């Protein structure tokens, strides 16, 4: 068949098509977003600038300093006693643990001994602080990945502990209870009984919280194999506390470099195996149980140890109220102690405690006056936050809040 209606021949399809102009390749720009500083999962005033390739995190840039108050500089203009309240405002989730480090540093400088009863009360409240911290962290970490009930239960328990704080020193949060040489005042027998009653009931609360989230499929999917830290990495980044114990390193200052009277207590150090967010969560849960054991032992020892809670060294201890009503010298001594303060010998000391978040250290330099020449605060959260970029690379965007939650960051101590 010929003509316009004839079927196409195979050769008709091989004619040269006109060449099209080359399309320039569009450069793909990385996606930058801000996480915080007003973000419910940011655990304080943290600003993260995230660089994303789709859903994959390529870079995390933490911007800190939004809660900087110049604590270390302010301390240089105040007496040692006036500086104790500053430590309550660092890690404000567990205030007394920070006071402890500062008091230990002053006691090292002065060579002052703490009476056994005062030492036991310190241990008791440091462990209450550990429970306060871990309750908040574990339950809000669950909230960060979608659970609503655990934080409600956690805050209910924390409220009971806050009441114990209030009954011991009059303040729910900023305690100002630890003093160089001991603690401010003794505990009443009824308070000791109530703490014991709480400590005996608390393991059941831990079981309830674990029943909600430990084997929860969604919680495990969001935390297992997320934010893995190997032993070598933990040491290289200068981690401490749960961040190293979650990776399987048995390092706890209460056991490795005992201070106060921790040598007299029986407790275990929980260790993780994989170094991921889930292992760190399990470590914190078990640490709360161990702290409860220490609390019960401390209460037993307190009942068997009557005596003073403050050193009898007049250089740092104020006179008793009854004595001030009788003696003019006692009144003058009290006035001088609280206005001028005590003087420390020249020197440098470093004191550290196993705070709930890790090793909290105080490097104190004295020039022989009544005020510190320099006080350098070593906050555990600072080292942990520094690794945020390295820990998040290659993870999904949704994993950022899970990793941040497992680092346990509080900005009072990071920004100081």
Swiss-Prot record:
Domain of life: Bacteria
Record keywords: Cell inner membrane, Cell membrane, Membrane, NAD, Quinone, Translocase, Transport, Ubiquinone
Main location: membrane
GO molecular function, one term: NADH:ubiquinone reductase (non-electrogenic) activity
Catalytic reaction annotation: a quinone + NADH + 5 H(+)(in) = a quinol + NAD(+) + 4 H(+)(out)
Record's bilayer topology term: Peripheral membrane protein
Keyword presence, Lipid biosynthesis: no
Entry's Gene Ontology cellular component terms: plasma membrane
InterPro entries: NADH_Q_OxRdtase_suD, NADH_UbQ_OxRdtase_49kDa_CS, NDH1_su_D/H, NiFe-Hase_large
Family matches, as Gene3D superfamilies: Cytochrome-c3 Hydrogenase, chain B
Self-association state and partner proteins as the record states: NDH-1 is composed of 14 different subunits. Subunits NuoB, C, D, E, F, and G constitute the peripheral sector of the complex.
PANTHER family to which the protein is assigned, alphabetical: NADH DEHYDROGENASE [UBIQUINONE] IRON-SULFUR PROTEIN 2, MITOCHONDRIAL, NADH-UBIQUINONE OXIDOREDUCTASE 49 KDA SUBUNIT
Function (record text): NDH-1 shuttles electrons from NADH, via FMN and iron-sulfur (Fe-S) centers, to quinones in the respiratory chain. The immediate electron acceptor for the enzyme in this species is believed to be ubiquinone. Couples the redox reaction to proton translocation (for every two electrons transferred, four hydrogen ions are translocated across the cytoplasmic membrane), and thus conserves the redox energy in a proton gradient.
Protein name: NADH-quinone oxidoreductase subunit D
Gene that encodes it: nuoD
């Amino acid at each position: 068949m010929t003509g316009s209606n004839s079927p196409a021949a195979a050769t008709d399809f091989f004619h040269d098509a006109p060449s099209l102009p080359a399309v320039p390749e569009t450069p793909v720009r990385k996606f930058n977003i801000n996480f915080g500083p007003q973000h419910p999962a940011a655990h304080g005033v943290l600003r993260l600038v995230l660089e994303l390739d789709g859903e994959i995190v390529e870079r995390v840039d933490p911007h800190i300093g939004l809660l900087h108050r110049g604590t270390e500089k302010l301390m240089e203009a105040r007496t040692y006693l006036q500086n104790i309240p500053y430590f309550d405002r660092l890690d404000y989730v567990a205030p007394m643990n920070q006071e402890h480090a500062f008091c230990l540093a002053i006691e090292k400088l002065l060579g002052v001994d703490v009476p056994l009863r005062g030492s036991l009360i310190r241990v008791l409240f440091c462990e209450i602080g550990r429970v306060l911290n871990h309750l908040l962290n574990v339950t809000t970490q669950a909230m960060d990945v979608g659970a609503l009930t655990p934080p409600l239960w956690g805050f209910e328990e924390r409220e009971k502990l806050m009441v114990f704080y209030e009954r011991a020193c009059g303040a729910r949060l900023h305690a100002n209870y630890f003093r160089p040489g001991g603690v401010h005042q003794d505990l009443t027998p009824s308070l000791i009984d109530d703490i014991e009653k709480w400590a005996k009931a608390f393991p059941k609360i831990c079981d309830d919280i674990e029943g909600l989230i430990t084997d929860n499929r969604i919680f495990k999917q969001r935390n297992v194999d997320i934010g893995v830290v190997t032993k070598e990495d933990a040491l290289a980044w200068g981690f401490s506390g749960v961040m190293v114990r979650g990776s399987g390193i048995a390092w706890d200052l209460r056991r490795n470099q005992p201070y106060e009277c921790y040598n007299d207590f029986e407790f275990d150090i929980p260790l993780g195996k994989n170094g991921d967010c889930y292992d760190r969560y399990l470590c914190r849960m078990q640490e709360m149980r161990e702290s409860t054991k220490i609390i019960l032992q401390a209460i037993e020892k307190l009942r068997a140890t009557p005596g003073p809670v403050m050193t009898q060294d007049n250089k740092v201890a104020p006179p008793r109220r009854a004595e001030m009503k009788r003696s003019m010298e006692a009144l003058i001594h009290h006035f001088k102690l609280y206005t001028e303060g005590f003087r420390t010998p020249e020197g440098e000391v470093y004191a550290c405690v196993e705070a709930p978040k890790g090793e909290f250290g105080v490097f104190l330099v004295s020039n022989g006056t009544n005020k510190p020449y320099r006080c350098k605060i070593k906050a555990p959260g600072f080292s942990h936050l520094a690794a945020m970029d390295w820990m998040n690379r290659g993870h999904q965007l949704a994993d950022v809040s899970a990793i941040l939650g497992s680092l346990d960051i509080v900005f009072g101590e990071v920004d100081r």
